[in-house]
């Protein structure tokens, strides 16, 4: 492989452009990387983005489970009233004066705040699979087969997000 480096020098006094060429032979084998050889780092933000895609396709106005009157999951992360109550309980334990209302589930910023409060309280050191499966299935969600299917959907979205 031959590498040609061509630096350009511009003199500010005469505004002349001069070219200086260097040739250097670099002997290195070309290494072909396979997808399994490349470690993809998935961030917490990637996880949240994937959850939003699975839950609502990014629709802040989404309403799911309409058959559960009064307990519908709504917003980008499909938050149920029980989750709002849980987040408010956590805030009370943390001696915070902040409280969320049901309508806050339609607000992307507040939805994300609620998610992180829940996650940091219950899943500070959990892996992404446990977080996703519990988000979908509740406190013991990681044990349910239905949440394993959910996790596969999240993984598929993560794969799409990390191929950039």
Predicted regions and their residues:
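Bacterial Sec-dependent signal peptides at the C-terminal "C-region" and cleavage site
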Residues: 3-23
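Catalytic glycan-binding domains that act on GlcNAc-containing polysaccharides
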Residues: 19-164
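Small-residue packing motifs within transmembrane alpha-helices
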Residues: 2-3, 46
């Amino acid at each position: 492989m031959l590498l040609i480096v061509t630096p350009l020098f511009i003199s500010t006094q005469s505004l002349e452009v001069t070219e200086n060429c260097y040739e250097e032979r670099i002997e290195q084998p070309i290494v072909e990387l396979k997808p399994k050889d490349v470690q993809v780092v998935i961030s917490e933000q990637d996880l949240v983005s994937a959850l939003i895609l699975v839950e609502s396709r990014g629709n802040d106005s989404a309403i799911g489970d309409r058959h559960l009157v009064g307990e519908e999951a709504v917003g980008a992360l499909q938050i149920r009233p029980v989750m709002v109550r849980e987040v408010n309980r956590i805030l009370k334990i943390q001696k915070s004066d902040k409280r969320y209302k049901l309508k806050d589930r339609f607000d992307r910023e507040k939805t994300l705040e609620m998610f992180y409060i829940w996650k940091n309280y219950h899943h500070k050191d959990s892996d992404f699979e446990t977080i996703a499966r519990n988000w979908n299935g509740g406190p013991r969600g990681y044990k349910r087969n239905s949440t394993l299917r959910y996790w596969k959907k999240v993984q598929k979205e993560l794969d799409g997000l990390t191929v950039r």
